[in-house]
Amino acid sequence: MMKKTLALTALACLISAPVMAKTWVLTSAESATDLGNWKVTSNMLKVKNQNFSIEQKVLHGGKQEGSKVIIITSKDGLTITLSPSRGMNLLRVEGYGVRMGWDSPVKEVVNPAFMNLESRNGLGWLEGFNEMMVRCGYEWTGHPVTADGQIYTLHGKAGNTPASQVEVEVSDSAPYEIRVRGLVKESTFKKADLQTMTELRYVPGSNRFALHDVLTNHADYPHDYQIIYHSNFGKPILEAGARFIAPMESISPFNDYAKAGLKEWQNFAGPTKGFDEMVFNIKPLADENHHTTAAVINKAGDKGAAIQFDTRQLPVLTLWKNTDTEKQGYVTGIEPGTSYAYPVTIEREQKRVKQLQAGQSTQFDLTYTLLHTSGQVDDVVKKIGEIQGSTPIEEIETPIAKE
């Protein structure tokens, strides 16, 4: 009996014991500290069975003067580049001969200090847009509109807000999970005090990473929120004959221009001059755990990018097909969100804008997987097929709104 009790006590201790980790604070607005150029490696941490590094670089020149990037490099896995200066956005992810990301005419990591989001009638956001993943929100998102005595600029402000607190954490034991956290504040006197603790989680050697973001309303009053995880992919995944796959209840064109592409929503053209962009609104299906997956896969079916998300947190999905010329920006977007990309005025009317009470928090969990073998692609195709089941996809020809 004594041995059994001791064994149970030991097991309880193991279950309740916190995971030990080393933490570095790279930036803190509260304590006015910034480590600037900084690096830690698996060798420095005396990790023997993994080869990885985490580095922060301060950039110089042009409109990226003073911008910071953090680069996670795993020799047998992914290289993930994100920017604390730009709302902890992900610039690109590379590994196994595949890239998640795209080639924008914007080549620099533009410092928000040089941005004017209200320029070009609310389209200033485009002057810095080159990321693999941008958080479009959280106070509002979508196309610009003037209402309520203000300009709601394109896709909100979070993606152009430098993080106030940036931390890197590495677990002390296998599998040595890396976490990069950044606190993004949208705080305006009399308007809002929304704060998002963003977190990227990556296990060295893996072909996937996760985002775990917690949005909190720090004000004494309720406040609306919206978010679109604008996730963008170009070559080598995107090409003529590439395909988009996702389980869905319905799909409809965003506007009249996209009507012409409705029957070909699943297929991508090569770079096409004058194509501009077509956008489609999707109502996704999910499994019994409310999880769903959307993916873009190349023509051969041996490369791709998949995003898993929770439809309780992110109930709608936008497909953005921008298969214009390569210099203009040959890219597609898979965009889980609380809203579609219509202006906030339309999203309010159609009751997709959500609200947080004073002091309330909500969270968003997404997993991104870089697919680099036909077997991995087949697994995702099978998973999506199982969620779709026998449910027919309804192709709705009329846009649900008109700007």
Which positions does each model-derived feature cover?
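Surface-exposed acidic/polar loop and edge beta-strand patches at domain peripheries
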Residues: K22-A210, P222-D224, F233-P271, K283-E403
